[in-house]
């Protein structure tokens, strides 16, 4: 099955997301998928809170005249803005945009709050819906008209040095987040022609899907003083002078959820990282005539033992065990524990890992400790597999001074190996003309094994 078909199929079968809402590019998070989203963003919120970011919430509606202040930035997506033009039947004097991103709203308010250097740094974030009128082919959780989970952080600083340090912190924070949800990545400095409009520079996280295409999953932007000058974000320095703040912003969206689904899934269904799994352990009673009560009493006892540390579900549906195995494999539940009369007689239980399919018989009397060990191995294995997957999709090609020869070499590598092609960095081919020659995207300048490369790939 092709990846695109598998992806659409698994979103429905595993109860992640329903596309049948009657607006293109808009869908519904189903309960199971929403829990994956919730647990994922809980990790992200914790990382932000621990680094002194404050969560807030800004309006969705932006007056047209305020949005227009963004100048160069708004040109990057002015054709994608949704507009509210009426209140009831009455035309509005000023059109209102549905939030495409929040620089305008947040910086307008920051101007009200930042007066002196002691007000800095200011580090705010929110998790909100944003809207883009996507005209390309929409894909659930990947390319949407309503992005339902956009975490955007915006910071303001008194000095360039503090601003640069914030970029480093943001990169480390995002790296830790993607490590926690077992999504592999490379980090690139985007080329000038593909940076965030209005930014000094953009750093981006990309992962690779099973079809060899890359997906941008996170961005970090150094805005310098560009937006501060537009929005008159001034403060009084310690020596009484006036200066503009230095700013950063960085975002992660539903693509993080799409990626953790896509990277580890297999022909059976999802393989969910433990920390974000809605159900971490499913219990399957193996019932035999005359032994039902014994088994159910024991498995309920096991449920009570495990649920103190894990999210556990006891599947007591009146259907065959094989059907239950299939259902929970589709949903990617990390561990399955089977318990039948013979297991009880032998003082044992059978644990099955979703990531490897390995079946492990453990002593029932020591089951909590055994589960803890297996969960730890599961987490470590997913991280190792994630790193292996991205390394298998990286190909280094030798540099050619002949641009046409180099472009043919890159195209051949993309065709044969897919994934990301790394070219030793050289300014002579770091341009849009070369990007057109190779008929692929230049991701940017990427450090790999101590050297600088130009990374190129087919992208979503």
From Swiss-Prot:
Homodimer. Catalyzes the attachment of proline to tRNA(Pro) in a two-step reaction: proline is first activated by ATP to form Pro-AMP and then transferred to the acceptor end of tRNA(Pro). Pfam families: HGTP_anticodon, ProRS-C_2, tRNA-synt_2b. InterPro entries: aa-tRNA-synt_IIb (IPR002314), aa-tRNA-synth_II (IPR006195), aa-tRNA-synth_II/BPL/LPL (IPR045864), Anticodon-bd (IPR004154), Anticodon-bd_dom_sf (IPR036621), Pro-tRNA-ligase_IIa (IPR002316), Pro-tRNA-ligase_IIa_arc-type (IPR004499), Pro-tRNA_synth_II (IPR017449). PANTHER family: BIFUNCTIONAL GLUTAMATE_PROLINE--TRNA LIGASE (PTHR43382:SF2), PROLYL-TRNA SYNTHETASE (PTHR43382). GO terms for molecular function: ATP binding; proline-tRNA ligase activity. The lineage of its organism: Archaea, Methanobacteriati, Methanobacteriota, Methanomada group, Methanococci. It is an enzyme of class 6 (ligase). This is Proline--tRNA ligase.
